[in-house]
Structure formats: structure tokens, C-alpha cells
Amino acid sequence: TAFAHLATLMADGTPQITPVWVDFDGVHVLVNSKVGRLKNANMAERPAVAIEISDPANTYRYVSVRGKVVAVERDGAREHLVALSQRYRGEPYPWWSAGEEREIFKILPERVVTRVIEE
């Protein structure tokens, strides 16, 4: 499963890019993050984001999404991360911190671009 790169906006307007695991609920792109991360603060203050996912087997095949964070949920966030870890790593999530809290950011796509160039 391909990693995504999430672009959020810093207070000065510069982008901050983070590799993330992503999910899709049929409407929203879902990003799971540990509470207190810089990307969380950026999305809370400035909900416009961009995400790009490239196919590791052909990096000229990708999907790019621009959208807005429309909801943040903590309920079920730990279980969601466990499921993401199974999909991305094939095993339980190994990096829990004591008292760790997680959030799921729901991103509503506003523009989606796909590209496929066969090598």
C-alpha cells in the first residue's frame, strides 16, 4: 500500500509536508495522527490541505487531492490506526506511547487529479 504525502499550511503560509497512511470512507480521505503533532495544529487552524499518493511500482501513476478538513474525531481513532497498520505493515501497530491519543481528520475532496504514464 502506497504512502501518501499530506501538505498542510503553516501560519506564515508555507507548506509543511508529511508522509502519512490514508484511508477512504467513500466520501472523505481519512488521516490518522497523534494528538499534538504540527500537522494537527495546521489543519485545525487552516483546513485547506493537499494529498498525493504515488504508485510505488510506477511513480508516474498518482492521484492528487485538494480539499478541506471538515471533521476531526477521536472516537475510534486507535482502532482505525490498528486497521491502517494491518493494511500498511501487515502487523499490529508497534509504536504506541503511554497515554497516546489519536485523531482522525476527515478531508472532503474538492479537486481530484489522476495521472497514469506507462513506462
Task: List each language-model region with its residue ranges.
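Alpha-helix boundary/capping residues
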Residues: 1, 46-47, 84-88
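Structural motif corresponding to alpha-helix initiation and N-cap regions
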Residues: 36-37, 90
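Short beta-strand segments
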Residues: 2-35, 41-43, 49-53, 64
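A generic "cationic amphipathic patch" detector
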Residues: 19, 26, 56, 80-82, ...
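Generic internal hydrophobic packing segments that stabilize the cores of diverse globular domains
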Residues: 40, 46, 78-81
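A short beta-turn/loop motif at secondary-structure boundaries
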Residues: 12-14, 55-59, 98-99
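Short secondary-structure boundary segments
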Residues: 34, 55-56, 109-110
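Charged, gly/pro-rich active-site loop segments
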Residues: 60-119
